Amino acid sequence: MEPLRVMRIIARMNVGGPALQAVTLMRGLPADQFEQRLYTGFVGPDEADYIDLRAPGLAVHRVPRLGRRIGLADDARALAVLATEMRRFRPHIVHTHTAKAGTLGRAAAILARVPGRVHTFHGHLLHGYFTPRTARLVAASESMLARHTDRLVTVGAQVRDDLLGAGIGKPGQYTVVPPGARLGPLPGNRAARRELGLPQAGPVVAYVGRLTRVKRPDRLIAVARDVIGAVPDATVVVCGDGDLAREVSRAQAGLDPSLRLLGWRADVETVYAAADLILLTSDNEGMPVSLIEAGLAGLPVVATAVGSVAEVVEDGRTGLLAPCDAGLLARCVVRLLRDDGLRHRLGASAAARCRERFGPERLVLDVQRLYEGLAVQHGWWPECWLLGATSPVPDSQHPADRVPR
């Protein structure tokens, strides 16, 4: 039985959930069953490349014009390169990740007549990114592309429901595959704080993620200001970068030394080890890997209740969720900083939940089953191959969450 050839396309490998998931699949799917190639562009000047930081040995095919920037001429060239590579590689399946790669990659797959097409929504662009008019155009484009896609994968059930509500795809096309993550060994708290130059005494609140508009770094600063005012010995650390990093740096002047900017770090485990809780302030999310990593590190989370965040963070059990309001978020943070017992209980529950549900092995198995279902459907593999296959989300009652047999 010949291995399935899978061409994986992602616009850029900037540090974040999509890059982590792509690397996990490239490394985790069995090589005797899947021949994979990863195609990606380059990160922007304000971004760190996940390949450089966490996966330097991974083979990557670079497509220069496939990055973040949108431009008709560059996108047309990237489309042509992808279609040419597909004709050479002759993949059974093209699997695209993120919006731009999903558009160009699926268009190229149609041109190159690739039979199997899969797209993963690691979130969506329906709100928080564009004007309402542009968001409607994005939804119309995604709806059209969905008609030419075999399987639509979402990282959470809420993301799926939002997309269906916008008229994108049909329920039977969808499969929910939550992210999978693993942390390396965590240093001790004192050693981690010493490495980061943080005070040994006092609580530490950490933000791990991009500094872009949808993540609302302005709200992050407002929360930090309120928390530091209420808990004067608290330190807020920001691990990340982005196009709004300069604005955050300017705001730091009024909060220094209680607000620390770390930039991107390859040793994110050090940040989690130094922290007492993790903060997320976004207007829109898929299923943030930083919250899964926080749970794996035994840390509670205070987050906005957006996207599929509530599928990671159980309000009152593994963290605290709040509306998109800086004052309410700050109150949740202060509550946890002042109640050591509650904070430790939530962190222990978060660790148990994330270790059970969000491991990389489960992610790989979910996607492997999805590919196997396509292989049988298209006649590439015999149907007996699926004997014993399980649903990607076994506890879900939604029919779209089961791999079509």
Please place each PLM-identified region on the residue numbering:
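Short hydrophobic beta-strand element within catalytic cores of glycosyltransferases
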Residues: P300-A303, V313
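A short, active-site helix/loop in glycosyltransferases that binds the activated sugar's phosphate group
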Residues: R147-Q173, A181
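A short, well-ordered alpha-helix in the C-terminal region of glycosyltransferases
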Residues: R335, L342-R357, L363-R369
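N-terminal strand-loop element at the rim of the active site
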Residues: L4, R8-G16, L20-D74
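Aromatic "clamp/platform" in nucleotide-sugar-dependent glycosyltransferases that forms part
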Residues: W264, D283
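A short helix/loop element that forms part of the nucleotide-sugar donor recognition site in Leloir-type
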Residues: E47-D52, L186-P199, V204, A351
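Conserved acidic donor-binding segment of nucleotide-sugar-dependent glycosyltransferases
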Residues: D315-G316, L320-G327, R335-G341
